[in-house]
Amino acid sequence: MADFAKLYNDPILSKKRIGSVEDPYLTYNETLTIFNGRALLTEIPNREFRVEVTGDNKEWREIEDGELDDNYFKVDYLMGVVFFNASNEGKSLTFNYSGEGASFFPASRIWIKRQGNMVIETLQGLIDEAEDTIIRMNERIAECERVTKRCQEVTAWCRQATSNYEEVVENTRKIYKPSVYTYSDIFTYYPTPQIGWTVTVKETKIVYRWDGFEWVDIGTSEVYEGFNILLSATEPFNANYIWYKDASFSPEKKRVVVSDTAPDSGQVWYKTD
């Protein structure tokens, strides 16, 4: 329901010229578009000087009564509204008149809903609701923009993290290749290595990895030849074993050891030259 305490303190603003030398009428020559069969003038036209309409290659005639033919128009000199036949909808015409001024009604004085003679909603209330809705929409849009920006930041971070991870993997992965006897053999057997290739030199037991530029010493390792050996009565599931079948053996895994001296008991010995 309208707030009548504010309503009666929201005045109608009016400017009325008297047409004297000190306060003359204001001459208007304005182009307006006909909408809903009417054109709203900027000011109230003076009835004595009338309203002249031109445009659309027609001779326009003002009437006060009767039907509006195609080139006829009526003027409401109290409200400053010019009426036309529906066939002229959307046309832009030029209006010449002497303006006496205008009255401006506040939105709070224009009702849009009522119950009997009681106004329950005004245009101002509708405007306020629309403005509140716009504010809420702008807040939602701002929040969506913040979330979108955060998602973009997280996406950028994830891409960078993935890139870093891929770089770490690329720089640390090891692709083991068959061992060679001397360091110089690496260049003979692997002339065009790829990043990550890892080769053990039997002579020194040093492991080298190609980092894309050179073979880098990454430490020493016990050198094993071939596969693990499994002494067992049953076949292993892992295909990377050499299986020595003997029903008298309990399952036992052995490794091949390269050495120039006899190893401890229980090891398979590969003697170097």
Curated annotation (Swiss-Prot):
Entry superkingdom: Bacteria
Keywords: Coiled coil
Coiled coil: 119-149
Descriptive protein name: SPbeta prophage-derived uncharacterized protein YomF
Organism, scientific name: Bacillus subtilis (strain 168)
Gene for this chain: yomF
